[in-house]
Regions:
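Conserved N-terminal glycine-rich FAD pyrophosphate-binding loop of Rossmann-like flavoproteins
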Residues: 36-56
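Conserved FAD/dinucleotide-binding core of flavoprotein oxidoreductases
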Residues: 88-116, 192-304
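Conserved N-terminal helical subregion
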Residues: 2-6, 50-177, 181-196, 267, ...
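Short, flexible helix/strand-to-coil boundary loops that buttress conserved ligand/catalytic motifs
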Residues: 42, 61, 177, 341, ...
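Conserved mid-domain beta->alpha element of the FAD-binding
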Residues: 8-28, 32, 164-165, 191, ...
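Short, solvent-exposed loop/turn segments at secondary-structure boundaries
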Residues: 41-45, 273, 340-343, 367
């Protein structure tokens, strides 16, 4: 097949990695995103990248954009540090202990980075303006042996040779493609916020400011997670200096602050928690930590009062994925996981780069599309579901996450 048109539902990190890969291969691609703009919803804050994610970005981006990514990514000390509620170190775990499932890196490419998620997404969006359609909520698709058509809530449709569901944990593509695939409540809830790094410098130790991530647990298994994002060059300045194809929003250095645990600890229903304002969530985080030392409670107390948001955590249940000739899935659409190992976004981007390589083989005549999808899905579900299970086991052990149904 010398010509191929790929439809991607979802403009998250995995779908954008795939799109960037396909542009480099000169494969026609169109992206459909349900949000009305890149900034419709909170994009989250710090993201830890391991060699899976970094390799995928390296393979997918053109050199100028990879240079911009590197210039705006923190290279932390590669440890996840376990501390007590007073932030005294109990042990430091090398990040590679739960790192890449790919096990290889390009020479000279770091194996661990802390990045600002919104900055990374903006870099991945660069150059996609002509193929990205916002406000397109996919409802279903129709496929036959020769093509697939994506149907949208606004009554429009798009036709291509392949549809990729990169549309997240509530994937409409997955509901039709793998209707027996299930997602379940992990039982874990969290409040995310951040504080300026200048404030954090007076509140936390050097290790907290330099390690990949730091986590404290109390007797109730309430946890406090802390992760720095220190830009080698501020994103907007890096973009102006390196003259890439687009601008980046300014963002100062910060420390992410996550307070989480079993949903019963929060004392409110999810609907009420979701309706709380940022300032109310900040106050709730302090009430949750009422038994913690005052010096540690000062960390969320000094957070930006407009930065706090609530997250419910769900996970996929590993299952058999039947073969399809022209519809596939990537990332959270098929193997969503709790963030206990920090692997979800890394694997979504790995999926995108892997699928891109297989589709490159299709247009070069090395294999047909059905073979490419079969090989991609076999590899992707093997490593993806393996990490889903490991993340659930770690969550159960550390914070009391619900076990996966097959393990209960």
């Amino acid at each position: 097949m010398s010509k191929l048109k790929v439809l991607i539902a979802g403009a998250g990190l995995g779908g954008l990695c795939l799109a960037q890969s396909l542009r480099r291969l000169d494969i026609e691609v169109e992206i459909f995103e349900r949000d009305k703009s890149p900034w419709d919803r909170p994009q989250g804050y710090r993201l830890h990248l391991d060699s899976d994610g970094i390799n995928a970005i390296h393979q997918s981006l053109p050199p100028d954009l990879y240079g911009l990514f590197d210039a705006t990514s923190m290279k932390p000390l590669s440890f996840t540090t376990i501390v007590d509620t007073a932030l005294a170190v109990k042990r430091r775990v090398p990040d590679d202990e739960h790192g890449s499932t790919q096990g290889n890196s390009f020479q000279g490419v770091p194996t661990h980075m802390n990045v600002n998620r919104a900055t990374l997404r903006q870099i991945l969006l660069t150059g996609m303006e002509d193929i990205l359609r916002f406000g397109k909520k996919l409802t279903h698709y129709e496929s036959d042996e020769g093509s697939v058509a994506a149907m949208f809530a606004d009554g429009t449709r798009a036709k291509g040779d392949l549809l990729v569901g990169a549309d997240g944990i509530r994937s409409a593509v997955r509901r039709q493609r793998v209707p027996h695939a299930d997602t379940v409540d992990s039982g874990i809830r969290a409040i995310y916020g951040r504080l300026p790094f200048s404030e954090a410098a007076t509140l936390v130790t050097d290790q907290v400011r330099s390690d990949t991530f730091t986590v404290a647990l109390d007797a109730h298994r309430l946890f406090l997670g802390l992760g720095p994002v220190v830009f080698p060059t501020r994103p907007d300045l890096a973009a102006s200096q390196m003259n890439p194809k687009g601008d980046l929003r300014p963002q100062d250095d910060y420390l992410v602050c996550i307070i989480g645990g079993r949903k019963e600890l929060f004392g409110l229903e999810d609907s009420r928690l979701s309706a709380l304002s940022s300032e109310e969530l900040q106050k709730l985080s302090l009430r949750l930590m009422k038994e913690w030392p005052a010096a540690t409670r000062a960390i969320p107390a000094h957070g930006d009062p407009n930065s706090f948001f609530f997250v419910e955590m769900y996970t996929s249940v590993p299952c058999e994925v039947p073969k399809s000739a022209n519809v596939t899935l990537l990332g959270d659409a098929i193997h969503a996981m709790t963030p206990t190992l920090g692997r979800g976004a890394n694997l979504a981007m790995r999926d995108g780069a892997l699928l891109g390589r297989h589709l490159g083989d299709v247009v070069r005549g090395r294999k047909n599309l059905a073979q490419a999808l079969s090989e991609y899905e076999t590899e992707m579900t093997t490593y993806g579901f393996d990490v889903v299970k490991k993340a659930a086991a770690m969550g159960l052990r550390m914070v009391g996450q619900n076990p996966l149904p097959s393990e209960s």
